[in-house]
Design a protein with these regions (language model features):
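Short, Lys/Arg-enriched N-terminal segments with co-localized hydrophobic residues
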Residues: 1-15
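Small cysteine-rich, disulfide-bonded extracellular modules of the LU/uPAR three-finger superfamily
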Residues: 11-116, 123-163
């Protein structure tokens, strides 16, 4: 007599994900006047806040609910420092009914790093999050340049658009 043995195994799968989004907390903070991308008087200051971009591995969980920069699952490697690069902001402007701002491209020169996504955050305002970038897959550099090319700064393409 032939008997089949059924084996039941339970697996707990933890899936990390990076989902591109403008952070919800950032939207509320905009309405509260927390972030200053330009040099117009804000909070009694005429200097723009410092925006930074940090790279993260595929183990990171970043999405619209991300409220602040954290070193958890941040990329590491030659040519990369924790906290990432300081961004150069393109002056906020508008076209039609859409306000927008963007950033100049940024490069980690002669670097050896792998990243799945990035977080743009405001280091002037307690590292509050602005936006999450999802690269779609791991991107790497090996003793070369790792460059993030931002889209055209216009009402249809800028990385931060409010319509």
């Amino acid at each position: 007599m032939l008997t089949w043995l059924e084996l039941s195994v339970n697996y707990e799968v933890i899936i990390m994900a990076i989902t591109q989004a403008m952070c919800t907390s950032f939207k509320v903070e905009l309405l509260n006047g927390v972030h200053a991308f330009g040099t117009t008087v804000a909070r009694g200051s005429t200097t723009a806040d410092t925006m930074k971009i940090a790279l993260f591995t595929s183990s990171a969980t970043l999405d619209a609910t991300t409220t602040a920069y954290s070193t958890s699952n941040e990329t590491s490697g030659t040519g990369y420092s924790a906290g990432g690069n300081t961004l150069t902001t393109v002056a906020p402007t508008s076209s039609g009914t859409t306000a927008f701002t963007d950033f100049a491209d940024t490069t980690w020169s002669t670097s050896t790093i792998t990243a799945r996504g990035a977080l743009i955050y405001n280091s002037t305002q307690s590292d509050k999050s602005v936006a999450v970038l999802d690269f779609g897959s791991d991107k790497s550099s090996s003793a070369g340049d790792f460059t993030i090319v931002f889209p055209t700064a216009d009402a249809s393409n800028a990385i931060i658009r409010i319509a």
